[in-house]
């Protein structure tokens, strides 16, 4: 009888350990997202995308800003003000809005960011961006699927 009790307790312990491990392996997603839509100077969209790929995304990552994705629209939508030839879109993620504010402030004070982005955007002959739109977002309570497609 004692043998069965020991086995039952051991089984429950392993079951609980497995359950805990399963919860620990669940992928969690940040609680705050930011959709950024840039209208680039004519003919400068690809240069803007290259600046993000080569420098800006790495600066953000250094400060704990999650680069969710960078996108080039494949068609224009005049109703939304999107011209596929000059629009660049990206999504960043953070644990919260307060963390977004803190992390962006740190990133924007980084000497490399100031050199790469701020100085270029202040120079009328070198700037890449005409206008930037920002949409703050949180996951819907019922369903949010964020997946990376190979």
Segments (PLM) and residue ranges:
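Surface-exposed interaction/gating patches
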Residues: 28-51, 55, 59, 91, ...
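The conserved glycine-aromatic submotif of the RRM
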Residues: 77-89
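Intrinsic, low-complexity N-terminal interaction/targeting segments
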Residues: 67-75, 80
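An amphipathic, aromatic/His-enriched active-site/gating alpha helix that lines ligand/cofactor pockets
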Residues: 25-28, 51-68, 83-85, 93-135
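Bacterial N-terminal signal peptides that target proteins for export
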Residues: 1-9
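Bacterial N-terminal signal peptides
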Residues: 9-17
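Sec/Tat signal peptide C-region and signal peptidase I cleavage site
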Residues: 19-24
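Active-site-proximal beta-strand/loop segments in catalytic clefts of secreted hydrolases
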Residues: 38, 70-73, 93-94, 135-140
């Amino acid at each position: 009888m004692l043998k069965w009790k020991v086995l039952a307790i051991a089984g429950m312990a392993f079951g609980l350990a497995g359950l805990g491990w399963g919860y620990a392996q669940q992928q969690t997603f940040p609680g705050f997202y930011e959709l950024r839509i840039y209208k680039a100077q004519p003919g400068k969209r690809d240069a803007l995308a290259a600046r993000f790929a080569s420098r800006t995304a790495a600066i953000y990552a250094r400060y704990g800003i999650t680069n969710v994705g960078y996108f080039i629209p494949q068609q224009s939508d005049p109703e939304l003000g999107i011209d596929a030839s000059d629009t660049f879109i990206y999504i960043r993620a953070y644990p919260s809005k307060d963390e977004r504010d803190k992390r962006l402030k740190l990133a924007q004070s980084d000497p490399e960011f100031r050199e790469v982005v701020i100085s270029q955007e202040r120079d009328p002959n070198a700037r890449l961006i005409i206008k930037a739109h920002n949409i703050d977002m949180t996951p819907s309570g019922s369903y949010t699927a964020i997946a990376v497609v190979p």
